[in-house]
Amino acid sequence: MSLFRIFINQLEEDDEDMATSKKMITREEWEKKLNAVKLRKEDMNTLVMNFLVTEGYVEAAEKFQRESGTKPEIDLATITDRMAVKKAVQNGNVEDAIEKVNDLNPEILDTNPELFFHLQQQRLIELIRQGKTEEALEFAQEELAPRGEENQAFLEELEKTVALLVFDDASTCPVKELLDLSHRLKTASEVNAAILTSQSHEKDPKLPSLLKMLIWAQTQLDEKAVYPHINDLSTGKLEDPSE
């Protein structure tokens, strides 16, 4: 049970005494409680390794494994392959990315039609970005239109994408965000998550979820007490309410 949850439970038991005011918790009291919480170093190391593996920091993961003795949940060699796929999408080399995914595991795209459509859609976007209008139209008709006939959501996405061809100036197009690099990143993240899932690994690192839980717990405790906060998650520094 987290420190915040312990405090919340304790404060709920003292509701009668807190009818008119919040409980004041000094920095000294708070730090004493923090220091009393026992965290295993092995658990912290596992959390760090999970983040490095999921986010694809293979060199950092290898170094951390040597220094801490923490074993990764998957073969680190697969991280390099996964990052190669992600980088290919981020660079607009979608066809290369698809080949790499199939080399890793053909079932990933065979069993995930939505992901495959999004990759093909990204290929179409890249053709439009390069000004290859005829090639883009041919690709849309041969590769994407048949999928749109089978899936209404795919058809709507295809229509939005083809709309990019109507405007000479992409900046005036209602769906210009498809040409943003952020759309490449979105597709790359989707592929990354699918590969992780195929390897029986969480698609998201645990650390961000724990930080969200921290924010939630602080919000819950705010209703019952005044205490030192962690306002900047990047530093983890405790700040008194008066600061």
UniProtKB/Swiss-Prot annotation:
Domain of life of the source: Eukaryota
GO cellular component, one term: nucleus
SMART domains, per database record: CRA, CTLH, LisH
Compartments in which it is found: Cytoplasm
Protein name per Swiss-Prot or TrEMBL: Protein GID8 homolog
InterPro entries: CRA_dom, CTLH/CRA, CTLH_C, LisH, Ubq-SigPath_Reg
Species annotation: Arabidopsis thaliana
Main location class: cytoplasm
Domain CTLH per the UniProt entry, residue ranges: 78-135
Self-association and partners: Interacts with RANBPM.
Protein family membership: Belongs to the GID8 family.
Keywords: Cytoplasm
Every LisH domain range: 40-72
